[in-house]
Amino acid sequence: MRSLRQDLVAFAVITAVIAGTMLSAHPIPIARPAAAVSIHVPVVEERVSSAAPDLGSLDEDIGSVIVISWRGDINSGVRSLLDDGRVGGVLLFASNFSGPAGLASLTDRLRALTTSACLDHPILVMLDEEGGQVTRVQAGFAPPAQLVAGSGGADHVRALERASAAGLHELGVGLNLAPVADVRTNSGDQVILDRSFGANPAIVSPLVGAAVQGLHDGGVGATLKHFPGLGGSAGDPHVAIPTDYESEAQWQRTQVPAFQAGIAAGADAVMTTALYVPGLGGGTTPAMFSAPVVARLRTQLGFGGVIVTDSLSMGGVGARYSLPEAAVAAIAAGNDMVLLGNGDPGYEAEAMAAVRAAVVSGRLDRVALHQSAMRVNQLRDRWGRRFVHCRALKAT
């Protein structure tokens, strides 16, 4: 187990680097942290088997594609799910811990639980740490993307993201739900704001790619969001599902390039969101529940990694779907991993039961679910962390 003192020292150094770098309002030389983190990341095999899986592994596959959240500290329900290996990941919020010391302690305990359970794949610890207004560790952990974009170019962004990721890595985070790849083309936008690198795809795209590289440099996985792009809409899906009225040609020109750049840089995951996109053939189905829209990530952008939903507990989603219905609809649309995003007791079991029933009834394709689970497990093997590998434990 790593030393908490080491975690906090590393965090202090990293936040000091970020703060010092951002003091100037003008482009400045890249600050290279003196104690840069050098981490070997194994290459992940993107291909998954198309062979018919054993139906006996259905519950394991369902668990792999589920990400849970909860309120407060680890409770008995969460402990039971982790002990049984029934979830692929956990998404932590500021309500789960207090500052960097609390986060380090929490991730240590989570990994201790999953190590003792001897899972075949480590738990994936996830966090929304974009910087600016969307921060979980503590205020000021990292600057907002818009400010970063205005203070330097791609090398500058990469250095800042490397420093931020090194801090997250030391605090036990495996996958960051960042960077934001949305290009803010709608002046009436209410949700992206300074979370985006800007309104010009020619400027935003290389910065998104640099952010992905910086996160990897620091030892953390990267997630592009919010596909197919919230920057062209004016509403907030946490309240009501917004609409992007861009045509296919406009979308190709404004929103696609940044996602392409992030994918080319090696993004591990892409987050889909609740957004009506009639110009893309989504009709009256929100993008992350629309198979034709989600499929564009595979067929048009050539993405072979994990497709993960935005929170299924957002207000806009809840007005249309129950949580179990949303989980099934999201998987049916081609998402590999679902963020349940709800702290109510028992919600995980309801969602898992609904997915299982959908597989048994034939609504969900069994082989497709297995392939999704394999992609997720590859992601867990790459960015999940544990103290002792289960194969070593089983050999003793």
Residue ranges and their predicted role:
Residues 114-141, 157-183, 204-228:
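Glycine-rich, aromatic-flanked loop segments that form ligand/cofactor-binding clefts
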Residues 150-155, 164, 192-193:
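Active-site-adjacent helix-turn-beta-strand microarchitecture at beta-sheet edges
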Residues 141-153, 198:
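A charged helix-plus-loop insertion that forms the helical arch/lid used to bind
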